[in-house]
A protein has these predicted regions:
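Fungal secretory targeting signals
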Residues: 1-23
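Gly/Ala-rich beta-loop-alpha elbow adjacent to hydrolase catalytic centers
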Residues: 213-222
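Short beta-strand element of the alpha/beta-hydrolase
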Residues: 73-83
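N-terminal cap/lid segment of alpha/beta-hydrolase-fold proteins
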Residues: 25-72
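Conserved acidic catalytic loop of the alpha/beta-hydrolase fold
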Residues: 70, 163-165, 169-176, 180-184, ...
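Catalytic active-site module of serine/aspartate enzymes centered on a nucleophile-bearing elbow/loop
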Residues: 349-378
Length: 378
C-alpha cells in the first residue's frame, strides 16, 4: 500500500512567493495530497496493418491530474508534450524524487495532462511502422544532458552546467534513474510529427481551451497543434524547442531540416509557403557573437504565420544547454513571422547553470515559477 501511495501521490505546493535569483523551495513548504487522477487514451485511428489484420494505432496515453478539491475559478489546463525518448513522467517528479512541474502547476490551480507520444511508453506501437530507435549509450546521454560541463566543450556554454543533481554519470543513482526512464521512440521525423500533431489535436479537442508546454523534439508538435487549433490553444510554452529554423545544429549535425521553418510538415503562412515550402526564400544572418550560431531567416518581406500569429508564446532556454547557441534564432524567426513571443534566456535573467533538462534539475521550481508568471499574463 505504501508503494502504491508513492506511485499515485503528487506533492502539492502551498501557495508561496518565489523571490528572484536562486531562491529554492524548502520541504517545509510542501504538503502531500492525492490529486484527482484519470487515465485516457486519445486520438489514433483504426488501421489496416496487414492484409488480414486491423489495429487501432497512433493514439496517446494521457494522465489527467486535477487539483482536489477543485478551485472555484480554475485557470486554463496545461497539456505537456515531452521530448525525444521521454514520457509524461518527465513532469511528474524528478529522477532524485523531488516534486516535478506537474505538482507545481497543480498547486496553482491548473489541471495538467501528462502523456506518452504515439509509439512510445504506454502508447501503442506495431512493429514495422516507421523506425524505432533509442536515446543512445549512457556516456552520450551524460555528455548532452546530465554532465554537460565535462563533455569536452562540445559547445561554448557547456562549461556553465551546474544544476544537474549528482554526477550525471553511470553509477550515480539520479543518473541511473534518469537513464532507466528513457523509452523507444519513432525516429522518422515526418511520421512522428504527423502522428503527434493528429493525436494532440484530438486531445485539445477533448480538453478545450488550454496551454501547451512542449519540450525539445516536441517543439514542432506544439507548433503543429497550435496551427491546427489556434482557436483553442491560448498559449504555447516552448522549452528549448526543436530547431533552429531550417536546419539541425550540433550535437545533432548540420543537415537541412524543418522545411517550413519551425516544422517539417505544413503550417499556414500568408502568402502561402507552398505545398512543400517551395515558396519560402531564406537568407543567412551572421551570428551575434562567437558563442552563438548564425541564423537562417526569411527574405523580406517575410511570410506571416497566420494561425500561430494568434497565439502568444514563451521560449525558455537553459544557460548551459546545447540550445544556448541557437534558440535566439528561433525567437527571431517567430518575431519575423508575426508571432507575439517572449524569450526567457535563463542565464541572462539570473537563473544560472541549467542544461536541456532544466525542468528536472535542482532549480526546477524556480524555472516553473518563471513560466507561471508568464501564464498569469496570458
Amino acid at each position: 500500500m505504501a508503494s502504491l501511495r508513492l506511485f499515485t501521490c503528487l506533492t502539492y505546493f502551498t501557495q508561496v512567493a518565489f523571490p528572484g535569483g536562486n531562491a529554492q523551495i524548502s520541504s517545509a513548504q510542501l504538503i502531500d495530497i492525492i490529486p484527482k487522477r484519470e487515465v485516457l487514451y486519445v486520438g489514433g485511428r483504426y488501421t489496416n496493418i496487414t492484409a488480414s489484420l486491423d489495429s487501432h494505432s497512433f493514439y496517446i496515453y494521457v494522465e489527467k491530474l486535477s487539483p482536489n478539491p477543485a478551485p472555484a475559478n480554475p485557470p486554463l489546463p496545461i497539456i505537456f508534450i515531452a521530448g525525444a525518448a521521454q514520457t509524461g513522467t518527465n513532469f511528474l517528479s524528478t529522477p532524485d524524487r523531488r516534486p516535478g512541474w506537474a505538482s507545481y502547476f497543480i498547486s496553482k490551480g491548473h489541471t495538467v495532462y501528462l502523456s506518452d507520444q504515439p509509439a512510445r511508453g504506454r502508447s501503442f506501437w506495431f512493429p514495422g511502422q516507421g523506425n524505432i530507435g533509442y536515446i543512445g549509450p549512457p556516456d552520450s546521454v551524460s555528455d548532452i544532458f546530465t554532465d554537460v560541463a565535462h563533455n569536452g566543450n562540445q559547445w561554448p556554454q557547456a562549461k556553465l552546467h551546474t544544476q544537474w543533481p549528482g554526477t550525471g554519470r553511470i553509477g550515480d543513482p539520479t543518473f541511473d534513474a534518469f537513464y532507466r526512464s528513457q523509452m523507444q521512440f519513432q525516429t522518422d521525423r515526418f511520421i512522428s510529427e504527423e502522428q503527434n500533431a493528429q493525436a494532440y489535436s484530438a486531445l485539445v479537442d477533448l480538453v478545450g481551451s488550454c496551454y501547451i508546454i512542449s519540450h525539445s523534439q516536441a517543439g514542432a508538435y506544439g507548433w503543429r497543434v497550435g496551427d491546427m487549433r489556434s482557436d483553442l490553444v491560448k498559449g504555447i510554452i516552448q522549452l528549448e524547442p526543436s530547431g533552429p529554423p531550417f536546419t539541425l545544429r550540433p550535437p545533432f549535425g548540420n543537415d537541412p531540416a524543418f522545411a517550413f521553418g519551425l516544422t517539417d510538415l505544413a503550417i499556414q503562412y500568408e502568402p502561402s509557403a507552398g505545398k512543400n515550402a517551395e515558396n519560402i526564400e531564406t537568407i543567412i544572418e551572421p551570428a551575434i557573437d562567437a558563442d552563438h550560431n548564425e541564423c537562417i531567416m526569411q527574405k523580406d518581406p517575410a511570410k506571416q504565420l497566420t494561425n500561430l500569429g494568434k497565439i502568444p508564446e514563451l521560449v525558455v532556454t537553459g544557460e548551459a544547454s546545447f540550445h544556448a547557441p541557437y534558440d535566439y534564432c528561433t525567437v527571431k524567426y517567430l518575431e519575423q513571422a508575426g508571432v507575439d513571443v517572449e524569450y526567457a534566456d535563463l542565464g541572462k535573467e539570473g537563473i544560472h547553470g541549467n542544461g536541456h533538462m532544466f525542468f528536472m534539475e535542482k532549480n526546477n521550481l524556480e524555472i516553473a515559477d518563471r513560466v507561471y508568471q508568464w501564464l498569469k499574463k496570458h
